[in-house]
């Protein structure tokens, strides 16, 4: 724990000593590309696709959204269309529909251009398998013997969220937890999300006795204690996602910020083709849901 506070102090000192002068780097400009953020899952709901145009790094204007596109997914037999949302420019939504696990889906996007041509984009993603159920969720401070996870920060207890479930034997499956508190989505951006590759623990009962014996627990989220109240409802949507999504996620996170020289060593990966016309990702997932009610185990009776 000492190393945790030492790192905090060092970061603070570096912040005080850092230069505040703006440095503007002259970057080569290119033609706008089409940004695609589309998802499809086994949940019975309206699935979304968001289409926009890229802009220069220093652009301060509103992002230009794509209008009038034709968007659909198909498994080769059935086709599901995303219809343009007239109240949200650039958003396209399906009718309520559920995808099927272990099924390959192809996303197709046709974007009309001002000269009458059409830009045709496509992507494929296998909607992966998922666990059958989450047996329970426990919210508690981390109690491992090592310092890999803090239990206290800024004089407040950290409450970690631990799901208990039988994981799939496939080590390439990645789990992404989506967290709600009292029906309010908390992980609504990628920077607030976690990706959990279980790796060598694939096939284990997650957070069960075998993992405890190895002093290994896997939390999926945390709360500062002051942000939790007795009887708060905490819901976990555990998404199983394709393994190639993890490279997109990490390069995207590395590329955030205001300095073009501090980021990923190459362009953010995309599974949208042709790659010289588009950026972004077509994201498939299967989802299993569980909910718990927070009880303060240290509350005085």
Regions found by a protein language model. Give the residues of each.
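N-terminal hydrophobic targeting signals that begin at the initiator methionine
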Residues: 1-2, 20
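Sec-dependent signal peptide recognition
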Residues: 3-10
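C-terminal motif of bacterial Sec signal peptides marking the signal peptidase cleavage site
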Residues: 15-18
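A sequence/structural signal for flexible, mid-protein segments enriched
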Residues: 20-301
């Amino acid at each position: 724990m000492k190393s945790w506070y030492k790192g905090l102090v060092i970061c603070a000192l570096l912040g005080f000593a850092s230069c505040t002068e703006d440095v503007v780097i002259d970057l080569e400009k290119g033609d706008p590309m089409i940004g695609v953020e589309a998802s499809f899952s086994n949940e019975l709901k309206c699935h979304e696709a968001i289409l926009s145009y890229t802009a220069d790094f220093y652009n301060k204007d509103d992002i230009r959204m794509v209008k009038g596109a034709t968007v659909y997914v198909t498994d080769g037999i059935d086709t599901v269309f995303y219809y343009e949302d007239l109240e949200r420019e650039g958003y396209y939504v399906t009718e309520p529909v559920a995808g099927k696990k272990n099924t390959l889906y192809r996303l197709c996007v046709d974007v009309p251009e001002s000269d009458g041509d059409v830009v045709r984009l496509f992507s494929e993603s296998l909607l992966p398998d998922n666990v059958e159920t989450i047996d329970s969720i426990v919210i508690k401070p981390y109690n491992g013997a090592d310092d890999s996870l803090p239990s206290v920060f800024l004089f407040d207890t950290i409450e970690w969220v631990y799901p208990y479930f039988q994981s799939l034997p496939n080590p390439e499956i990645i789990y992404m937890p989506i967290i709600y508190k009292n029906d309010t989505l908390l992980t609504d951006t990628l920077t607030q999300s976690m990706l959990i590759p279980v790796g060598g623990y694939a096939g284990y009962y997650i957070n069960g006795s075998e993992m405890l014996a190895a002093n290994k627990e896997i939390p999926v989220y945390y709360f500062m204690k002051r942000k939790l109240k007795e009887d708060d409802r905490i819901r976990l949507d555990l998404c199983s996602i394709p393994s190639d999504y993890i490279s997109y996620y990490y390069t995207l996170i590395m590329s955030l910020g205001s300095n073009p020289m501090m980021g990923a060593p190459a362009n953010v990966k995309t599974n949208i083709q042709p790659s010289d016309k588009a950026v972004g990702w077509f994201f498939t997932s299967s989802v299993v849901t569980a909910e718990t009610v927070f009880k303060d185990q240290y509350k005085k009776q």
